A protein has these predicted regions:
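The feature marks the mature, well-folded catalytic cores of soluble enzymes
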Residues: 1-183
């Protein structure tokens, strides 16, 4: 599976002139093969096998979905530079966050800083939990001022620590299948 399109605003949003909010690890080249999220997916696969028993037919679909997700995570965020005038493409050996760090952007992690949490706790209890409430998807009203879902307390705290004004609003309905639907 080759991932061609991604709603970038679920993983990355510019929140000020030189500040970006992003999901940790995913958009950084140094984690392309060792992203902690890949390890969590391995654990999910192991737990799934244990729950389903030894019958390979029972977990074949699960294995292929997990492998596809892992490959997609490895492929997300690589930067291609296009030359002005010619349109010639050059694939860089960098992901989006790497390029922005070289340009002195402040990178603000969804879920806030890891602190003393283990990597697994940080991902499960903060990053993925708040990502479920669209923590990476804030709306910039103007540079340095964003609207964010109030449920994402760690992300909001990280934004404020970085000097971004946050206008929170209740969006608890997101937990129910990610928002209102017309059926």
């Amino acid at each position: 599976m080759h991932l061609q399109f991604l709603h970038l605003d679920t993983f990355f949003t510019l929140v000020d002139k030189n500040k970006a909010l992003t999901v940790p690890y995913v958009l950084e080249a140094r984690y392309a093969e060792t992203d902690p999220i890949l390890g969590l997916l391995d654990r999910v696969e192991e737990d799934s096998r244990a729950m389903q028993g030894a019958d390979p037919a029972r977990h074949k679909n699960s294995d292929s979905r997990i492998a596809a997700a892992q490959q997609a995570i490895r492929e997300i965020g690589w930067v291609t530079r296009y030359e002005a005038g010619t349109g010639r493409a050059t694939a860089l050996q960098e992901k989006l966050v790497d390029v922005l760090r070289k340009r002195n952007y402040t990178i603000i992690p969804v879920g806030g800083e890891k602190g003393s949490l283990s990597t697994e706790e940080y991902l499960l209890e903060r990053v993925l939990f708040e990502l479920n409430f669209q923590a990476g998807n804030v709306v910039a009203l103007r540079p340095g001022v964003v609207v964010a879902y109030a449920e994402n307390v760690h992300t909001i705290a990280a934004l404020r620590m970085a000097g971004v004004e946050v206008l929170p609003f209740e969006g608890s309905y997101l937990a129910m299948w990610h928002g209102d639907r017309i059926v």
